[in-house]
């Protein structure tokens, strides 16, 4: 039985972010739909060929998406919200973009669909909307067209489909409440149709993704898998695909299904290979996810070989990435600035394909010399001086309970803060960043390339900060921000100023739609060699009598949005970051900054996928935030910001952060997230986001007032702040001014209505 290689998916955006540039050009009206489609075809062809050349035997098809693969599945099933539909009922790429971002070059703008985190990753998906009595039909044939493309190029392929049960699990009911699982019988005929079309094309295997099978699902959802897969069986071979956790707790459900193979994530799960082999039906193929699809570290292939070799020859076996390589940068070979030693520790998507090929060849032949050679650098790293800092380890060991306690409880602090700031009712603010204009990006790029000296760079940044303050004062905002002109990314910026991180030139990964991020890599112990944000915050505060917030990214978010070390726990990394940023809080306070925002949008996304594992994570995650913040005096107001969150099940931990003010994303969910705070009787102040910054649509004054009145039905008005959902970095100035002007006007109207 020859072992084969495959990946669960490949990055979509292109090495130079070609897809992002094509999308944004099309959205801006600067290029045609045909030009956009051509870029997609070119990228798919390139990526298939690159994977093939790197040693992948079965290429994934259907992993490409114009915005998000869950949204692609919604269109496949004809699940288009009424507000986004074309007048003639047709579905096209602009339909997709209207759902994802609220507008497109054609059609009427409408509120974008909700967006949330894809399991516990930093990728976002567009949440499917379901209504009672909804009908489904095959309306979007992108998958079939891409299969035809790949077959025409002569590739051996494995189409990828998001499975029906997980698709329903990921969605939300809109309108009259009902059990969305009852729609399963209605979507299965579309899946049957698609599988029949794939069978007609000679497809042998289909990867059908059911990552919900790693969760602690309600019994009714577990019971739904058997009838669903009974309906789908028989047309092609199905590789039931799971990732991000192990499957052992749900293995009884899985082995009863009429599928021909199972993919398991052997990186993030705790499944035992021998037990899986023993319990799976003898004729099933096992796809072993041995190469980490979510990190950038070179694998110790000698360990991987030892992990799987015992079952070689005993059942059909493939070796694969743990999950889609969507979460990894594309190609390490173009990184020319990385230190040679550090570069030898890494592997990006194409190198991970090569790792799979090396592992396949060794498992098929029994020859391991190539694995030992490949693994030598990562083994040598364990003893590198770049990794360990005795002073950091000593400080971490000395943390006491007192380090995470503010001097007094919120009620006492709030009095001191009211006396200091004297803010009006319904105080207005923004979340931190202002539009990153072409001029700002060009300034940073010229400085980075050495085309601009430090003095001229600083003069330019100072001018943009000054303009941001002027804009906010004109708008009448109450608490200002400096606008973050000097920051490329909220995590990358801090990583650049902390020891223990390294950065790539082209290590882009998709976050959502056209948004890409370049996560820093944690390679060693973390410390702060010098103040990071103090100079610009102090300068901004000197320009105005209104309070200017100091802006920090919190320790858990920096951890979650970086590629972490694999040789220490996530708790250790988070607390090292917290100690470094604790010093930053103290320095900001000493510089006269009275309001300091510590963003933790990733706190919830970092949750383990199984609830039984949550408590331990939340305990150290909350402690890390408090270590970061607790150095502040009573009169210093600590804000935190969170987005894409369901808060119901972690309200105890949100309250335990003990932030004086929390700002949250609520506009896309029509303030329903505030139910959690109301039910919990959350004691501190809250700023529910009143408009969606991910959409270019400008909210009306009436819309914002209505949302705020809805918020005031749940939270006492004296504890409410008024702010957008998130930072304004990706928006343009005209829409930013218009939206903020309406927001300020709505707040003024509510003050006068008292």
From Swiss-Prot:
Tell me the superkingdom of the source: Bacteria
**Which Gene3D superfamilies has this protein been placed in?**
3.20.20.210
Enzyme Commission number: 2.1.1.14
One GO molecular-function entry: 5-methyltetrahydropteroyltriglutamate-homocysteine S-methyltransferase activity
Which residues hold 5-methyltetrahydropteroyltri-L-glutamate?
Answer: 17-20, 117, 515-516, 561, 605
What is written in the cofactor note of this entry? Binds 1 zinc ion per subunit.
Entry keyword Disulfide bond:
no
Q: Which reaction does it catalyse?
A: 5-methyltetrahydropteroyltri-L-glutamate + L-homocysteine = tetrahydropteroyltri-L-glutamate + L-methionine
User: Which positions in this protein are listed as binding Zn(2+)?
Assistant: 641, 643, 665, 726
Names of the cofactor(s): Zn(2+)
The protein's UniProt keywords, in alphabetical order, are: Amino-acid biosynthesis, Metal-binding, Methionine biosynthesis, Methyltransferase, Repeat, Transferase, Zinc
Kindly list the biological process annotations in GO that this record carries: methionine biosynthetic process; methylation
Pfam families from the xrefs? Meth_synt_1, Meth_synt_2
Which portions of this protein are annotated as coiled-coil regions? none
What SUPFAM superfamilies does UniProt report for this protein, alphabetically? UROD/MetE-like
Role noted for this protein: Catalyzes the transfer of a methyl group from 5-methyltetrahydrofolate to homocysteine resulting in methionine formation.
Family from the record: Belongs to the vitamin-B12 independent methionine synthase family.
- What name goes with this protein? 5-methyltetrahydropteroyltriglutamate--homocysteine methyltransferase
Origin species, per record, is Salmonella enteritidis PT4 (strain P125109)
Source species taxonomy: Bacteria, Pseudomonadati, Pseudomonadota, Gammaproteobacteria, Enterobacterales
